[in-house]
Design a protein with these regions (language model features):
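A compositional/biophysical signature of low hydrophobicity enriched in polar/charged and small residues
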Residues: 1-155
């Protein structure tokens, strides 16, 4: 990070994370700049890593019935090599959308995209329980989505 984010930079980040298709002209108009300085700011935000990448958000309901399951994993103590192996395997499983390490009774929390309870049961026994160091799994099945956003507050 080469400099502190200005109010204009923050506004640009708010706009592009809500709509990655927004044009530089639309951003410039919204933040009160001409297109060239706006484009330079946008490039700097990308170059400095504030904007990691631009993606399309898929409506999962259009793909058929699905739901998310949050699974907490209790782990045995792993060596650094085993921990690295665990992370490589987690990263290679496309149905695991997010993974976090935790403080508390459980050690890892994952968010899993599931098509059915039967699929998830097989996933637990054939995939999760075979990961290095997994001792126990507690799962929470979602029944509805009240709020979903990928936008983070940039105040």
């Amino acid at each position: 990070m080469s400099e502190e984010l200005s109010a204009i930079d923050r506004s640009i980040l708010e706009l592009v994370q809500r709509n990655a298709d927004i044009s530089t002209g639309e951003i410039a108009e919204a933040v009160g700049l001409s297109q060239s300085p706006c484009w330079r700011r946008l490039q700097r935000l990308k170059d400095e890593g504030y904007i990691k990448r631009q993606v399309a958000l898929i409506d999962r309901q259009k793909l058929g019935e699905s739901f998310f399951i949050f699974a907490s994993l209790k782990m045995v103590t792993l060596t650094p090599q085993e921990r690295a192996d665990f992370m490589r395997k987690i990263e290679a499983i496309p149905e695991i959308l997010e993974c976090y390490t935790l403080f508390g009774e459980m050690d890892v929390m994952i968010k899993v995209y599931s098509q059915s309870m039967n699929w998830f049961q097989n996933f637990v026994f054939n995939v999760l329980m075979k990961l290095p160091g997994v001792q126990d799994i507690q799962s929470t099945v979602t029944i509805s989505e009240l709020k979903y956003t990928t936008a983070i507050p940039v105040r």
